[in-house]
């Protein structure tokens, strides 16, 4: 298993897919990393040479990933809450932040529906 940015990449997958296991790296970023490192997208993680691994590591180190990225996202949310913005209030209340309607849906954000006693009459 190749270990990049503190994440063990699955050996049997292609490197372009394996890189997406790192938080903060999606499909397009993974392709850019491999292009800059000069590594083929079709090569499997187990077939990487140590030199190729090091080139990929150098490219990944230039991007904010994993713990640093998670910390920045949580700090951004905390900042929104502290300044009392609408988005911060929605985060604090556990409701959708991006303007979605909540009359019928938003179960993922709001949690499981709670029945109200004697509601039906």
From Swiss-Prot:
One GO cellular component term noted in the UniProt record for this chain: cytosol
Biological processes, Gene Ontology terms: translation
The keyword Disulfide bond appears for this protein: no
Transmembrane portions of the chain: none
GO molecular function, one term: rRNA binding
Sorted UniProt keywords: Ribonucleoprotein, Ribosomal protein, RNA-binding, rRNA-binding, tRNA-binding
Region Disordered: start-end pairs: 88-121
InterPro entries per record: Rbsml_uS13_C, Ribosomal_uS13, Ribosomal_uS13-like_H2TH, Ribosomal_uS13_bac-type, Ribosomal_uS13_CS
Pfam family, one: Ribosomal_S13
PANTHER family on file: 30S RIBOSOMAL PROTEIN S13/40S RIBOSOMAL PROTEIN S18, SMALL RIBOSOMAL SUBUNIT PROTEIN US13M
Subunit structure: Part of the 30S ribosomal subunit. Forms a loose heterodimer with protein S19. Forms two bridges to the 50S subunit in the 70S ribosome.
Family the UniProt entry places it in: Belongs to the universal ribosomal protein uS13 family.
Role played: Located at the top of the head of the 30S subunit, it contacts several helices of the 16S rRNA. In the 70S ribosome it contacts the 23S rRNA (bridge B1a) and protein L5 of the 50S subunit (bridge B1b), connecting the 2 subunits; these bridges are implicated in subunit movement. Contacts the tRNAs in the A and P-sites.
Name of the protein described by the UniProt record: Small ribosomal subunit protein uS13
Gene behind this protein: rpsM
